[in-house]
Amino acid sequence: MGEKSTGPNPTDRSKSGTKRSLLVDGQGMPIGITIDGANRHDMKMTRATLQNIVIHRPLPSSSLKLQQHICLDKGYDYPEVYELLEEYGYTLHICKRGVEYNNGNKKKRRRRTPKYRARRWVVERTHSWMNRFRRLLIRWEKKEDNYIAILHFVCTWITYKRGGVFG
């Protein structure tokens, strides 16, 4: 079906699939995106996603005002990811693999794990916004460049609608 950015998806009876790795800001605005085959592990797409940031990123600083945080899930809990994010100057918030957290009272959970308040729902919401576009939900494009162009158009549309700059 596609070029190198598709691969067999084991949960979909070996049909080709595409995985989107998305980096968003705190409001859900997309700032970096990359694609690969559906059978590719998330951790291996981290560097490409960080390299595809399309806006000018201020240099990280020791002051609290310029620190840049990144929230990831347990799928990124590998030493290579820690080193990469340290190289890029991010303050990492990640849940450790094999550690269960209290799913009950939110106040109690925050008190127990103050540095693990990863807000993954922001990224999931942006993926949901992207899935409103049928062209992305069902991949019809055979060429990777065409699919990436549509992804960038959708990211621009989301930024336009969420930004409120033009009314």
Show which residues each predicted segment covers.
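Generic structural signal for secondary-structure transition and capping sites
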Residues: 55-58, 135, 158, 162
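Charged phosphate-binding loop/patch that engages nucleotide di/tri-phosphates or the phosphate backbone
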Residues: 150-167
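Compositionally biased, low-complexity segments enriched in small residues
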Residues: 5-7, 11, 111, 139-142, ...
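Helix-centered, glycine/charged polyanion-binding patches within enzymatic domains
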Residues: 58-143
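Polybasic low-complexity intrinsically disordered regions
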Residues: 1-91, 96-97, 154
